[in-house]
Structure formats: structure tokens, C-alpha cells
Amino acid sequence: LDTLQIELGYGLLSLADPKKGGDLLERVTGVRRTFVQEMGFIIPAVRLRDNLELQPNEYRFVFRGQLIATGEVMPGYWLAMNTNNSTEVLPGVQTTEPVFGLPATWITDVERKNAELAGYTVVDAASVMVTHFGETIKRTCYQILSRQDVQVLLDNLKDQNPALVNE
């Protein structure tokens, strides 16, 4: 049983396929690297896998066999979030951004420039997933941190501050 998995609907497989320009695994590795720097312990390797039971554009984050988060993205589209209270209404598919619960709109590449000029924050589908993954890991890291991880942290701290560890 893999500790952490990202399950992808078949419509999202291109996001993970380098031959099709997908860099999802590389981005997830970046999240893990950042997490080590910020939190001080290593997130276990993440396995990407397809899951034909999911809707085509659905993804799930699974930790030790338990679902911890789910979402849906639209590859080839851009998620526009009205973070500056713009009065501009964008044509597209209305949705809710999965991390912060903001109202958002999936827009085409043609609408992207208009959205940016109107003050919207615009991100691609893989960025939405990776941000969701990073925030989910931060929220659930207390479950991921093992006794062995704590021992490694203490051993490293002992080199720098032995008196603190002895207390």
C-alpha cells in the first residue's frame, strides 16, 4: 500500500505524461521539496495512478488507502479567480476553486488575457491540482509524520542544540 497517491481520471493523464508536455510529477516533487524546507521532514514518495472509476477530469488524494481530498479540473482551460473584486464577468464554466473555496471560472486560452487585464488570478489545471495537493499535505501532515520522522528531527536538532533535546 502506497503511503500517498494521486489518482487521476483518464482525462487528466496527459498532465502526468512528459511526452504530452505534462509535468505533474515534477511539480509534486517540487511541493515535497518545499515542504521539507518549510516543515523539516520528508513527505513520502507520491505515486500517480489512473483510476477508471473516477470521472474523466476528477482527481483524488489518498493517504494510506483513505481519501483525504478530491477535486476536478479542466485540462486545456485556465482557472480564473476574481481576487481583486473585478466587475468584469468572464464567459466560461463556473466553479469553486478547491483550496480556498473561491468562486472561479474555467476559461479558454482566448479569454485568458482579458481575465488577466481585468485583475483575475489565472492558473492552469496542473497548478490547481498541485496547489490543492500542497495545502492538503499541510492540513494532514500530522497524520503523515511518523515516529521515525520525529526521531530524525530530534537527531538533527541534537547536533545543533543538545540541551533542548535532553529536556
Where are these regions (language model features)?
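Membrane-embedded alpha-helical signal segments
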Residues: 1-167
